[in-house]
Swiss-Prot record:
Annotated ranges, domain Helicase ATP-binding: 95-240
PROSITE patterns found in the cross-reference section: HELICASE_ATP_BIND_1, HELICASE_CTER
Induction trigger: Expressed in the early phase of the viral replicative cycle.
PANTHER family: GENERAL TRANSCRIPTION AND DNA REPAIR FACTOR IIH HELICASE SUBUNIT XPB, RAD25/XP-B DNA REPAIR HELICASE
InterPro entries hit by this protein: ATP-dep_DNA_Helicase (IPR050615), Helicase/UvrB_N (IPR006935), Helicase_ATP-bd (IPR014001), Helicase_C-like (IPR001650), P-loop_NTPase (IPR027417)
Full protein name: Probable helicase D10
Length: 450
């Protein structure tokens, strides 16, 4: 039997083999909100006899003892990529670089240096490379790394630009999808940052049409709340590199009880119940006071929230108290974001309040040392991603702190219990901040005048 691989693996199976392959690439995912499992299918019919499965699932044919002739029509686009100026760490990055020779996932915690390793692999494979990012901020971070380590200007797709001439091109996923057909056979290597999003429609659209010879997925977590991580192998195969945790400091979790109830009334939409918490004066005052406390202790504090009005209210109050503040939200211009990050890195203690969607993934501002989660979070991977923003090692930086706010009521306590399980699983120290401990901390921050 002949199997042709390009963007997918195309073949002519008999009914028995196709029934097996079809079942093995069909997933039934249980959800909390649906009475029945949701079905996802990652195989299909091209014509009466021609079927397709993911390239990375040829193991299904091997499992049935099928002998086949492989015709590889994937894109190879050799280019000269300059040798990068960085040096890989021998204890964790270099072994992966030496072993990696095909499509795979690199599952490294924040601080591991996934960006550097991926750029090294782009150099190793020597193929015209496309880096796909979740947003423009991360895209600009990748572009800056290419300039810094390779000494050339990368191509950019997005923000009104379409330059695919350089050997490395960086784009955000939304723009790539618009040009998917034209780009499907241009690149020999595709690197997908924050690959845990890859089973979302916006990512699968391009991955399913791309004929790139090498596909590399990067992520700090391979967990998804919806369970769709079972499909990762259909896009990046079974090879997963999970390096040990290095180059980071484990945070200490300071847990504060907030006298605000999170309603458990299922008849009220979640967004409205969350709004009741976010709009509560006690909740807002708690975040303001804690941000003021930790900045006075010398921290560079990051507050994340998914409510712009809450971010702006908190920053206004802190500014009135004389605290140096910064804001990064969706409306913040890209150049302004970069300038803010530069000012924070060079400056003293401050508070940065930012949109959670921007800072939950990939933004590297290593000088941040304290995280205040200003949203109601009950998602293991999101907690780990956010905590990673303050875990990176920088000379002179204070030991990282993550501030956990515990709401009243059964729902609030259940969420707090879920977050506590994440902290335990990661081996992070937790401290319950009783009123007495909070007073002691305030005396350290503000002196006896507090």
């Amino acid at each position: 039997m002949k199997v042709v691989i390009s963007n997918k693996a195309y073949f002519k199976p008999d009914d028995e083999l196709w029934d097996y392959c079809s079942k093995q690439t069909t997933y039934h995912i249980e959800t909390m909100t649906s009475k029945y499992p949701i079905m996802y299918k990652n195989s299909g019919v091209v014509a009466k006899e021609i079927k397709w499965i993911p390239i990375t699932r040829l193991d299904l044919l091997d499992a049935k003892g099928i002998k086949y002739e492989l015709v590889d029509k994937r894109t190879l686009a050799p280019v000269d990529i300059p040798k990068p100026k960085f040096k890989l760490r021998e204890e964790d990055q270099l072994p992966i670089y030496e072993e990696c020779d095909d499509t795979c996932i690199i599952n490294g915690k924040p601080g591991f240096g996934k960006t550097i390793l991926a750029l090294a692999l782009a150099y190793k494979f020597g193929q015209k490379t496309l880096v796909i990012c979740t947003n423009t901020s991360i895209r600009e971070m990748w572009a800056a790394e290419v300039r810094k380590w390779f000494g050339f200007e990368p191509g950019i797709i997005g923000s009104g630009k379409y330059n695919i001439d350089p050997p490395i091109v960086v784009s955000n996923i939304q723009t790539v999808n618009k040009h998917a057909n034209n780009l499907s056979k241009v690149f020999g290597t595709v690197i997908v940052d924050e690959v845990h999003h890859c089973v979302a429609t916006t990512f699968t659209n391009f991955l399913e049409i791309s004929c790139a010879r090498y596909k590399i997925g990067l992520s700090g977590t391979l967990k998804r709340k919806d369970g769709l991580q079972v499909m990762f192998k259909d896009f990046f195969g079974y090879k997963i590199f999970s390096p040990p945790v290095n180059n980071t400091v484990a945070p200490t979790i300071h847990r504060y009880s907030v006298p605000v109830e999170l309603s458990g009334n299922q008849n009220v939409p979640w967004a409205l119940r969350a709004n009741d918490v976010y709009n509560h004066p006690e909740y807002r005052e708690t975040i303001i006071n804690l941000a003021h406390l930790y900045v006075n202790m010398g921290h560079k504090v990051l507050i994340v929230s998914d409510r712009t009005e809450l971010i702006q209210t908190i920053l206004e109050a802190l500014t009135q108290r004389g605290v140096t503040t910064y804001e990064i939200i969706g409306a913040t211009h890209l150049d302004d974001r970069l300038k803010i990050q530069e000012d924070i890195a060079k400056g003293g203690p401050c508070v940065l309040a930012a949109a959670q969607s921007i800072f939950s993934e990939g933004i590297s501002l290593n000088e941040l040392s304290c995280l205040i989660m200003g949203s109601l979070i009950n998602n293991e991977s999101l907690i780990e991603q956010l905590a990673g923003r303050v875990q990176r090692i920088v000379e002179g930086k204070l030991d990282p702190i993550v501030v956990d706010l515990i709401m009243k009521g059964g729902t609030g306590l259940r969420q707090a219990s879920g977050r506590m399980a994440v902290y335990r699983n990661n081996g992070w120290k937790t401290i319950t901040m009783t009123p007495e401990k909070a007073v002691q901390l305030a005396k350290i921050a503000f002196g006896n005048s507090s």
